Amino acid sequence: MTLAHSLSFPDSLRDGPTVGDLGEFEVIRVITEQAGSSLNGDDAAVLRHASPNSRAVVTTDMLVAGRHFQLDWSTPEQIGQKAIVQNFADIEAMGARPVAALLAISAPTHTPVEFVRGLARGMNQRLEEYSAELVGGDITSGDSLVIAVTAIGQLGGSLPELTLGRARPGQTLVAHGKIGYSAAGLALLQHFGPDNVPEHLRPLVDAHCAPVLTPGRGMVARAAGATAMTDNSDGLIVDLNQMAMKSGVRIDVDSSSISPDELLSEAASVLGTDAWRWILSGGEDHTLLSTTFGDAPSGFRTIGQVTKTRHEDLVTVDKKTPAFSDGWRSF
């Protein structure tokens, strides 16, 4: 058995041709049918700037089957939604507006065309929320199933981009979105499998398989005077550590502002674990984390303060060493 054929797709996707049966151009046609664009079809896409002083913001991220998603846990649509959100969150974290995406797929020849169709459909669902388009990409055969998305955003106006190194003492730490939900959903899937998760805990699983990001929050924060921003992809403490290190500051998180809600507490009770691990080190929520002077921007809530107080940790919780500080590792 080859490595490629060790990748197993759900039975529900197998009724029909494979990508090997159709070939490259027919598979591309399947994708564009689900996520069409007037800019897609030439050797490259030409994007117009929204205004003369607009700047381009570009990022890329990959999802690897068995590493970032499980085919028996997530539908193709959910995988497509996740691929867009994790990239667009990086664009939002710069204070920019996502406008386009490119999709590159490396897939075994036995990959069902129905998987690719569902993937593109899920991507388009998230793209439409942003009025963005899939403007091109590439597909090739390979032993592993790898999905790579390049996201393109536009940064208008004269305000600076929201980099990691612009947090200053005296500023407020704010957040938009749930924290700990994705990690809790993953833990539930690992324990129960995809079909036996208690129904009232399904929102946590959904947060892991198909995260949601409210469009435009990064732009709102930038317009309101935000300085530094990132998204919670690798774990709250890990991501805030990067911000603190690059800004040369300390960040103290207020535990009462991020304490486990009823859903997280119930999941932790069911699994016999500590919900704080999910909150502090879980990641993949793609919650926007920002620093700002004054009140939290619309849609954000205050969760801490930026200080210059000496402490052995760059990031503290209630001015103490965090109980959990590990996070996602790529290697």
From Swiss-Prot:
Binding sites annotated in the UniProt record for Mg(2+) 5: 234
SUPFAM superfamilies, per database record: PurM C-terminal domain-like, PurM N-terminal domain-like
Catalytic reaction list: thiamine phosphate + ATP = thiamine diphosphate + ADP
Binding site for Mg(2+) 4: 43, 59, 90
Binding site for Mg(2+) 3: 43, 90, 231
Binding positions (Mg(2+) 1): 60-61, 138
This protein's record includes keyword Cell wall biogenesis/degradation: no
Binding site for ATP: 137-138, 233
Alphabetized UniProt keyword annotations: ATP-binding, Kinase, Magnesium, Metal-binding, Nucleotide-binding, Thiamine biosynthesis, Transferase
This enzyme's EC code(s): 2.7.4.16
InterPro entries, sorted: PurM-like_C_dom, PurM-like_C_sf, PurM-like_N, PurM-like_N_sf, ThiL-like
NCBIfam families the record matches: PRK05731.1-4, thiL
Functional note: Catalyzes the ATP-dependent phosphorylation of thiamine-monophosphate (TMP) to form thiamine-pyrophosphate (TPP), the active form of vitamin B1.
Assigned protein family: Belongs to the thiamine-monophosphate kinase family.
Note: Reaction mechanism of ThiL seems to utilize a direct, inline transfer of the gamma-phosphate of ATP to TMP rather than a phosphorylated enzyme intermediate.
Protein name: Thiamine-monophosphate kinase
Organism: Corynebacterium glutamicum (strain ATCC 13032 / DSM 20300 / JCM 1318 / BCRC 11384 / CCUG 27702 / LMG 3730 / NBRC 12168 / NCIMB 10025 / NRRL B-2784 / 534)
Organism ancestry: Bacteria, Bacillati, Actinomycetota, Actinomycetes, Mycobacteriales
